[in-house]
């Protein structure tokens, strides 16, 4: 259960001052005023009026203390602001309002479209308290000393909530800098009325070269994901730095775009596959889960040659203005209620083990939808590793693939 850490707040001093002041007033009323009344109205001095007045004062004291303590204790960050930089449409509908109500802080959330866009903005000095980059970008930012370590309390509390498969991934082996926000895999979304499981088992990633599906496939406009697919189809590591292996993957993709007439898309694949506009496509597991929930004829397959196990995680940049509140936010997001809101609304897999089991289990929102629960512990699945030289090579080769695709029409 998430409980906001208790910290000394300046308003405690105000409470102490109020206690002293009101007790002094009460004693004055009870002890001084009767002497005045004795001089002016001796016949009434034995009436219990002074206890009534004292009672009113005491009630007022208790009410004042309760109200002030409630405000100070339950909203220790009142008046503060948290700046978050996250992907678009990646937050549950009650996440922000829930955290603001709990802490009294105001949350300002900006959105980015790519890890590279986020990196450039932060590298240029824009200050955020919480970022939600992908695994390989977190590794890069750690290498460049752009992040600060999490509080020990945050690390301990959050790790206790996480699915084992998402703990200690290679980019941050001890989770000293990051706590997962969502996770998943990359796979093939397919129309079960057009594509058989036998085809998928036989071809794996090479199904994107099967002439039976020419003109009926989507590729995803991402050099990392497209080269991952090609490298895995060829039996290579997706983290290879071999120029020969990268060239082989390039030729595989060239063959695909020149012979298969694919449509290269981004998020359009979600609605298009939900409407069964093509037979199959390269997709993130969370998007596939949505497609399958919208269309019962859709399936999701992860080839046996392996795929990418990815994670987007929360980190705190070195130049964060409110790291204490940032740690509070990270603990909040990992808690059951917030994680449930996030995952049930967005559709991506929660790192919170209880939420994942509930949503993906019997009677859950994603019961029977295998895309919601990523394959874990498979030795041929990999997490992306950051290598600047390889990144530049792949970016250049992917640009050539897209030119070839345009010329093929």
Please report, for each region that a protein language model flagged, where it lies by residue.
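Early extracytoplasmic/lumenal segment of secretory-pathway proteins
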Residues: 67-68, 73-144, 271
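Mature extracytoplasmic/periplasmic domains
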Residues: 312, 317-378
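Conserved C-terminal helix/tail region of periplasmic/extracytoplasmic solute-binding proteins
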Residues: 374-409
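Interhelical loop and adjacent transmembrane-helix boundary motif
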Residues: 1-28, 32
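Short, low-complexity disordered leader/linker segments with a strong preference
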Residues: 36-81, 406-409
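A ligand-binding cleft/hinge motif common to bilobed small-molecule-binding domains
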Residues: 137-140, 274, 280-297
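Periplasmic-binding protein-like
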Residues: 247-256, 294-318
């Amino acid at each position: 259960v998430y409980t906001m850490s208790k910290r000394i707040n300046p308003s405690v001093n105000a409470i102490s001052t109020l206690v002293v002041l009101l007790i002094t007033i009460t004693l004055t009323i009870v002890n001084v005023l009767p002497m005045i009344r004795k001089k002016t109205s001796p016949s009434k001095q034995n009436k219990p009026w002074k206890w009534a007045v004292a009672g009113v004062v005491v009630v007022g004291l208790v009410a004042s203390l309760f109200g002030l303590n409630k405000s100070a204790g339950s909203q220790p960050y009142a008046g503060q602001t948290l700046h978050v930089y996250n992907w678009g449409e990646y937050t549950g509908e009650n996440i922000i309002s829930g955290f603001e109500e709990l802490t009294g802080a105001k949350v300002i959330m900006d959105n980015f479209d790519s890890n590279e866009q986020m990196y450039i903005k932060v590298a240029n000095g824009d200050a955020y308290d919480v970022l939600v980059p992908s695994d390989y970008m977190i590794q890069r930012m750690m290498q460049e000393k752009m992040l600060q370590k999490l509080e020990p309390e945050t690390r301990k509390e959050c790790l206790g909530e996480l699915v084992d498969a998402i703990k200690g991934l290679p980019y941050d082996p001890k989770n000293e800098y990051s706590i997962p926000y969502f996770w998943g895999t990359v796979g093939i979304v397919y129309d079960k009325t057009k594509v058989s499981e036998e085809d998928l088992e036989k071809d794996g990633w090479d199904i994107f070269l099967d002439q039976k599906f020419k003109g009926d496939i989507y590729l995803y406009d991402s050099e990392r994901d497209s080269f991952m697919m090609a490298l895995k189809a060829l039996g290579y590591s997706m983290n290879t730095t071999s120029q020969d292996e990268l060239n082989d993957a390039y030729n595989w993709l060239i063959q695909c775009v020149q012979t298969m007439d694919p449509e290269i898309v981004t998020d359009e694949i979600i609605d298009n596959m939900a409407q069964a506009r093509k037979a199959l496509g390269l997709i993130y597991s969370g998007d596939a889960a949505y497609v399958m929930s919208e269309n019962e004829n859709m399936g999701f397959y992860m080839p046996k040659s392996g795929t990418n196990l990815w994670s987007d995680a929360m980190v705190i940049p070195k130049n964060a203005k409110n790291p204490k509140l940032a740690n509070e936010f990270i603990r909040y997001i990992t808690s059951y209620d917030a994680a449930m809101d996030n995952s049930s609304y967005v559709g991506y897999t929660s790192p919170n083990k209880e939420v994942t089991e509930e949503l993906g289990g019997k009677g859950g929102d994603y019961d029977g939808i295998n895309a919601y629960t990523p394959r874990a512990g498979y030795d041929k699945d990999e997490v992306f590793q950051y290598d600047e030289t390889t990144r530049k090579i792949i970016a250049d080769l992917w640009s050539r693939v897209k030119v070839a695709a345009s010329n093929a029409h």
